[in-house]
Amino acid sequence: MPRNPKSFRLAARNIFLTYPQCDIPKDEALQMLQTLSWSVVKPTYIRVAREEHSDGFPHLHCLIQLSGKSNIKDARFFDITHPRRSANFHPNIQAAKDTNAVKNYITKDGDYCESGQYKVSGGTKANKDDVYHNAVNAGCVEEALAIIRAGDPKTFIVSYHNVRANIERLFTKAPEPWAPPFQLSSFTNVPDEMSSWADDYFGRSAAARAERPISIIVEGDSRTGKTMWARALGPHNYLSGHLDFNSKVFSNNAEYNVIDDIAPHYLKLKHWKELIGAQRDWQSNCKYGKPVQIKGGIPSIVLCNPGEGSSYISFLNKEENASLRAWTTKNAKFITLEAPLYQSTAQDC
């Protein structure tokens, strides 16, 4: 039996409305809610979301936050009328006990509009699970932190750095896969030895490749196209300037490594033999980083410029590196570029 309108009373700061089978555009519905006959207590935030319901009709869900506790006694207070036809809509009305949960629920389809400044609620202190559930489902890092601050202030203060680090990790987006700006076919001046190396390795299936493939060390002036050529060959790890085996930038599923402008004396101190020698199943030991297990078994394309401190050939020709030179010549081919790898002036890296 319907509730007697005279017995209706809504005393709440946060209100959750659902208008079933309501086809009023969400932005127009928001304006209608803003212009209701509010008394002293007025909306500080409104979010209106459209849901395509299973019954084939759109529903509107609304979250309203007020400047104070309401005292609404008119059951028809939230009724709205379609702006272009004579159709009235009456909502289901509830107090929103957990505004974060309501906010996340009504916008699960992503079709919403809003007005005002949302006030974060962390849920009840007695139920920390709700706090962290709401934080995980927040829209951004700062919103998640605000939820935890409100709902679990002790943990927020005592373990702030850990809490922030964990939240930032959860909200970190995977980097976009690198796309070469130039097609491999645009490199028309590649030395035969480089082309043969690439054809031999990439022309085989993974199962048919050598257990430890040969790497190549390519030395040439800047803007000869060596970086763009190396990066256009296939899925790879790009190590530039220093070694970083963080899982965000280094993948054990890559087909080869590109080692670009990493000083030879630095690589000698780190993982020269592991990377150039295509060694398998080894562990990184880079300073300031946690040890990482590397699958390996893939070749490296080492790119360098001529000159002291940059040239791998000059570095290996030093007397103190004689044994390393002997090892490297068995595990890598050396190529010196005499001209750019392309004919036009488009590629300059």
Curated annotation (Swiss-Prot):
Gene3D superfamilies: 3.40.1310.20. A motif (RCR-2) lies at residues 59-61. Its EC number is 2.7.7.-, 3.1.21.-. A divalent metal cation binds at residues 51, 59, 61, 109. GO terms for molecular function: ATP binding; DNA binding; endodeoxyribonuclease activity, producing 5'-phosphomonoesters; helicase activity; metal ion binding; nucleotidyltransferase activity; structural molecule activity. Residues 9-118 form the CRESS-DNA virus Rep endonuclease domain. Disulfide bonds: none annotated. The active site is at 105 (for dna cleavage activity). Belongs to the geminiviridae Rep protein family. This is Replication-associated protein. The lineage of its organism: Viruses, Monodnaviria, Shotokuvirae, Cressdnaviricota, Repensiviricetes.
